[in-house]
Every structure is written in C-alpha cells, then in structure tokens.
C-alpha cells in the first residue's frame, strides 16, 4: 500500500452511487480482524473504498451471532463504521429487534475474505430465536472487548486463550451438544469456563448433562481449574432469577438457583457490559486474587492462614477476600469461616459496579463485611490499561498481500 493512503468515510444513503472500482484484489483467502475504510490513489484519480480489519470484524460478528443489537455493535465499533456497511448494503437493521443482521451481499464478501468460515445460515425471525442470538452476541462483544479471541469455529481453538460458541457446531447437520444450554465456553488464564445465560424466566437445566458435555468436550484442553459463569445484561438480572422461587414439573431438571446451591465448581456472576469486560480481563491473569490483594493492601498484606482457601489475605488480622470475580459463594464461605474463627466481619474489595449493585447490600449493610472499591490505579498496575480492546484501524490484507475494495455487489 502506498504511503500516500488516506482515510475516508462514506456517508449518505444506500441509494448514493459508490465510486467505480476494479476487480483487482477483490477475491481472497485470508486472515484478519475488522472496520472503517481507507482509500488509495488509483490511475485516473479514481478512489476506491478499502475495507479494514474492523469492517471484517463487524461482518464476522454478524455471521457468528446473526443478530447483534445496534447499541451493542456501536459500543464495540464506531457508529460511522457500522453506518458505512449499512450504506453499502452489507448489513441491515432488523427494526422489530433494533438489531443488525447480515445481507446476502455481506455474506458473499465475508466468504471471499475467509473461505473457511462457518456457512452462512439465513436468520430466523421468530422472537425467541432472535432473543437467543442477541444474548449470544452480548457475551461475544463482552469477551471481544476483553481481548479474547472469539471468532473460533471448533472447540479445539480453546487450547489457546479463546471463546467458543457451541451454537456454531449445532449448525453443521450433527449436534454434538445435544440439548445442553451452555451458551459459550471460555479458556482464560488458568480457567476453563462454561458460560450460561441466566436471566428472569430462563427456565431449568439438566445439570448432569451439562457437566458431562462440558467435561467431554474440553477434557483434552489444559486448564488448571474448571468453572461456571452465570451471565446476563446485569447483576440484577442474574440475582433476580436466582432469588425467584420456582415450581418444577420435571424432577430431572434443576433451576439455576439449585445449580447455584449444589455446584461443586467455582461459580462467577458476570454482566455483559464494561464491568464484565474488566472482570474477564482480571480472570485472564493467573493468580489474580493474590496479585490484586498485594497491590491493594501493599505493606498491610499478610498471607492467609493455612486451611482457609476462601481467604486471599489478612488485613490487620481480618480475613480479606478479592471479590472482583464475583464468586459470591466463596465470599459467603469466608464469612462463615471468619465467624467460626471468632471474627464478626471480613474485608472484601471489588469493582465499583459490583460494590454498588450487589456487595454493599449483601455484605456491608448486613454487617458481614467492610467493602472496598478497587481503584483504577490498582487495576492499571495489574492489567496495564483499563481501556477495552479495540481492533486496529488498518486495511484488511488478503493472504496474497492484496486488499479488499468495494465490489459491484448485487442488491440483497
């Protein structure tokens, strides 16, 4: 690419005529990431729109999830980037759900860029199907902004730090996941996590089937600890479902409250927002609890006593728990252990939204704990930066070193 390349944006309506382009560099097989556009000088002073890695990431989001809420897509990418692709008729807004979906033209472009992607499947416009896809997209955008590799097509990708959506496998004729309700699998740090969407009215789950599928599909993947994550749009949604008393018609199934009470694996609560993004980044750091405890307590840090794995440190003789992972059952275990040790209150630290939405009410106001907020400075010391991941705003290059420009795509 020439050093004279200049950035350009496309603004207008779909009826606006696009610049004339040539066929050169149009077809490709490549790897890359996704978004806005740049132009390069052409003979006769023609200008062509060049797709960037950010553009291609937007299109891949829609291939994986089929529907992404407009507000979620524009939280991960610039609004102008999304509008550019809409103007080019590569994506369109499904008005009833206020969610973007891919057009036939967008699918053709994506197939040219990534020949080995999951096959395009026409979106189902039933409300329940659309809602399920939107929830998957919320999980995916949260992980994406945490720097997790999300565009995976097989569970083997979890040998590295990545997220895999089982719904991708369910679209290939066979269904190795059966009727399990797992929304995503995540390998981050030393953890292998099964993520379930838990919000009001979500229903019941066959826990034995879930755990069997989780173990069978990830047995060959190295991870020191397996865990489960309950996710939703907010902590309030998760806790609302967990606190609801339900009558069951099928004794083989468990409510998510029953899963919460009986699960032997670590269990984290996570919202699909900026706090959830930070939470995932913290989980990606091996030994994050001790590291954060040392950063926060500084010279006041003292190691926890033997036989108290639910403590992360002692702070002036008081049990200290690092609660940024939102393992509430571990906090409750620390409270009980402290009382058995003759200590009436523990100390815990967490992210601001966690403190305000959950921990103050459950622990500070009930006298169970002193609750501290983790500062940005402490997070920067652990993570380097608290800013969410943003893909590079660079041209998308094919495996042959060419670029993708605007092809004369047919109207969808």
PLM regions: where:
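Electrostatic, structured charged patches in enzyme active sites and in nucleic-acid/phosphate-binding
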Residues: 137-412
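Nuclease-adjacent, charged terminal/linker segments that flank catalytic cores
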Residues: 2-164, 168-192, 229
């Amino acid at each position: 690419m020439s050093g004279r390349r200049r950035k350009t944006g496309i603004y207008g309506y779909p009826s606006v005529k696009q610049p004339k382009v040539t066929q050169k560099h149009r077809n490709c097989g490549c790897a890359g990431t996704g978004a806005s556009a740049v132009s390069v000088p052409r003979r006769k002073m023609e200008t062509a729109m060049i797709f960037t890695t950010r553009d291609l990431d937007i299109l891949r989001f829609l291939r994986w999830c089929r529907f992404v809420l407009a507000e979620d897509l524009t939280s991960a990418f610039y609004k102008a980037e999304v509008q550019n692709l809409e103007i080019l008729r590569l994506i369109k807004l499904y008005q009833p759900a206020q969610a973007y979906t891919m057009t036939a033209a967008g699918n053709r472009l994506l197939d040219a860029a990534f020949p080995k992607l999951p096959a395009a499947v026409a979106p189902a416009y039933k409300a329940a199907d659309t809602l399920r896809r939107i929830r998957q997209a919320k999980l995916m955008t949260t992980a994406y902004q945490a720097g997790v590799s999300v565009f995976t097509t097989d569970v083997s990708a979890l040998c590295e730090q990545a997220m895999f959506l089982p719904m991708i496998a369910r679209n290939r004729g066979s269904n190795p996941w059966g009727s399990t309700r797992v929304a995503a699998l995540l390998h981050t740090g030393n953890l292998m996590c099964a993520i379930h969407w838990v919000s009001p009215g979500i229903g019941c789950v066959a826990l034995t089937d879930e755990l069997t599928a989780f173990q069978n599909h990830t047995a060959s993947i190295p991870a020191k600890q397996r865990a489960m994550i309950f996710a939703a749009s907010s902590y309030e949604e998760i806790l609302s479902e967990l606190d609801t008393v339900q009558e069951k018609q099928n004794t083989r199934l468990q409510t998510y409250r029953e899963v919460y009470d009986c699960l032997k694996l670590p269990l984290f609560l996570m919202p699909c927002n900026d706090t959830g993004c930070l939470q995932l980044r913290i989980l990606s750091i091996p030994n994050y609890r001790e590291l954060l405890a040392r950063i926060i307590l500084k010279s006041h840090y003292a190691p926890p006593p033997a036989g108290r794995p639910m403590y992360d440190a002692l702070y002036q003789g008081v049990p200290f728990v690092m609660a940024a992972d939102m393992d509430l059952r571990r906090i409750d275990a620390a409270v009980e252990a402290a009382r058995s040790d003759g200590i009436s209150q523990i100390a815990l630290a967490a992210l601001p939204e966690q403190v305000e939405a959950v921990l103050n009410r459950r622990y500070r106001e009930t006298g169970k704990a002193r609750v501290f907020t983790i500062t940005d400075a402490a997070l920067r010391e652990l993570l380097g930066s608290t800013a969410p991941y943003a893909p590079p705003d660079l041209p998308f290059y094919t495996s042959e070193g060419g670029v993708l420009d605007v092809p004369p795509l047919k109207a969808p």
